[in-house]
């Protein structure tokens, strides 16, 4: 196994089809083609793949992370991890963690104040991964998923702005 991490080439339809297949097989939510295009067309620099150069198909992703970033309430820049998937035969080798680290690093360089995501309450592997990387449970969202499963919203604070209520930031109450 020789894992290489790189940005997704959005012009490569084979890579796109592979990450769609990987995510569709791995996540509980079905995503339409429009959701993928929304992320990939607006934030192509925030999608990374992992490939195994020693496999018979070295250009086919065995892991991926799909992210975006937006202003949040016009007071902070929020990164968002929308999708993270690793092929089941490659789990347990730190691939998901490395993909998250790459995404966090990129969002920090883009001056995000925080990074947010949701994950299923029952997904202990994901919760252990994210909380081990510093993400904090912010709230439980009941019946969040189509399967009526609950989700936790997790946030990784990156700057002081992330630790200050938006109301105070909007009204200029943050001491600088």
Curated annotation (Swiss-Prot):
Entry keywords, A to Z: Acyltransferase, Cytoplasm, Nucleus, Transferase
One function term, GO molecular function aspect: protein-N-terminal amino-acid acetyltransferase activity
Regions annotated as coiled coil: none
Catalytic reaction equation(s): N-terminal L-methionyl-L-leucyl-[protein] + acetyl-CoA = N-terminal N(alpha)-acetyl-L-methionyl-L-leucyl-[protein] + CoA + H(+); N-terminal L-methionyl-L-isoleucyl-[protein] + acetyl-CoA = N-terminal N(alpha)-acetyl-L-methionyl-L-isoleucyl-[protein] + CoA + H(+); N-terminal L-methionyl-L-phenylalanyl-[protein] + acetyl-CoA = N-terminal N(alpha)-acetyl-L-methionyl-L-phenylalanyl-[protein] + CoA + H(+); N-terminal L-methionyl-L-tryptophyl-[protein] + acetyl-CoA = N-terminal N(alpha)-acetyl-L-methionyl-L-tryptophyl-[protein] + CoA + H(+)
Major enzyme class: transferase
One example of a Gene Ontology biological process annotation: regulation of protein localization
Main location: cytoplasm
Domain N-acetyltransferase, first and last residues per copy: 3-159
Segments passing through the bilayer: none
GO cellular component annotations of the record: cytosol; NatC complex; nucleus
EC number: 2.3.1.256
Location(s), subcellular: Cytoplasm; Nucleus
Pfam family, one: Acetyltransf_1
Note from the entry: Present with 1940 molecules/cell in log phase SD medium.
Assigned protein family: Belongs to the acetyltransferase family. MAK3 subfamily.
Function: Catalytic component of the NatC N-terminal acetyltransferase, which catalyzes acetylation of the N-terminus Met of L-A virus GAG protein and possibly GRH1.
Subunit and interaction comment: Component of the N-terminal acetyltransferase C (NatC) complex, which is composed of MAK3, MAK10 and MAK31.
Listed PANTHER family: N-ALPHA-ACETYLTRANSFERASE 30
Protein's recorded name: N-alpha-acetyltransferase 30
């Amino acid at each position: 196994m020789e894992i290489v991490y790189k940005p997704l080439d959005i012009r490569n339809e084979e890579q796109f089809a592979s990450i769609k297949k990987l995510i569709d097989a791995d996540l509980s939510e079905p995503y339409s083609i429009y959701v993928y295009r929304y992320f990939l067309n607006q934030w192509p620099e925030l999608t990374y793949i992992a490939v195994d150069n020693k496999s018979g198909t070295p250009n086919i992703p065995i892991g991926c992370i799909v992210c975006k970033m937006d202003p949040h309430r016009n007071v902070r820049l929020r990164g968002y991890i929308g999708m993270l998937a690793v092929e089941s035969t490659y789990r347990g080798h730190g691939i998901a963690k490395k993909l998250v680290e790459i995404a966090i690093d990129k969002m920090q360089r883009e001056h995000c104040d925080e990074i947010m995501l949701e994950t299923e309450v029952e997904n202990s592997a994901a919760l252990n991964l994210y909380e081990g990387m510093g993400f904090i449970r912010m709230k439980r969202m009941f019946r969040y998923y189509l399967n009526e499963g609950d989700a936790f919203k997790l946030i990784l604070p990156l700057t002081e702005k992330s630790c200050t209520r938006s109301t105070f930031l909007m009204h200029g109450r943050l001491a600088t």
